[in-house]
Structures are given as C-alpha cells and as structure tokens.
C-alpha cells in the first residue's frame, strides 16, 4: 500500500496540466504592454522550462460595481517579454478578442500561437498586452501547462 502523503512529495514536474500562473481581479481597463504580469510558479521556475497547454480568462467583474460589462471587444495578447514585441507572443500575435466573456460566470480559453505546440518556454513570467480596453473591467487569468524541469 502506498503512503498517504505520496502525492504531496511529488512536484509540478511529476504532473501534467498544472496551473503555472494565476492572477485574480486584474484590470483590462487600460491599454498597453505588460499591463498584467503572470509570474510562473509565483516566480519559482528559476532555470527550468515549461510547456503551455491552456490560458483561460474568466470571472469578469465590474470594478465600479453593478452589472458586469461585456468584454467582447477587449483584445489581449500574452507575451514572454514585457516590451510588447509580438514576435514573443504565446497566443495569437494580433491579439484575441474575448467574445465569450460577456457576463458574470463566463470564460474563454485563448488560442495559443503555433509555436506553443513545440516550444518549451524558459521565461520567469508571461505578460498581458491589452490592445483594446473595456472600462471598469477586471478578470482572472490562469495559465496551465507542464513543467519540464526546474
């Protein structure tokens, strides 16, 4: 029989589809590069690498209170650099609209760039570039993937 704490002894590189990064209540009300930083493993990836599997935008909220505004016109790109250089995009480089994030309790997986299917990334953080903002909005962003090494 296995030990009851066997799973707790494993690390992220022993599991697939681990949540690599998460930010809660991040504003999409302002355009710009690196509006939101997504530190990988809370900044603990060190010299390792990871494979991206999914990036989910969820739980929209109205920062001014009241009904959640539709984010259907919001446009975001996720990058490995904070300079806005779209050659470093891990999602669609031209940005992706959040057409499914239109009310409370809605979510959307972002389309990963073609390079994400064959690349193990080493960046310590990912960055959100907001191309088109929506006033008084905030969302949660989750990044899922596999840790290749620490």
Show which residues each predicted segment covers:
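Surface-exposed, low-hydrophobicity beta-strand/loop segments enriched in small/polar/acidic residues
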Residues: 2-150
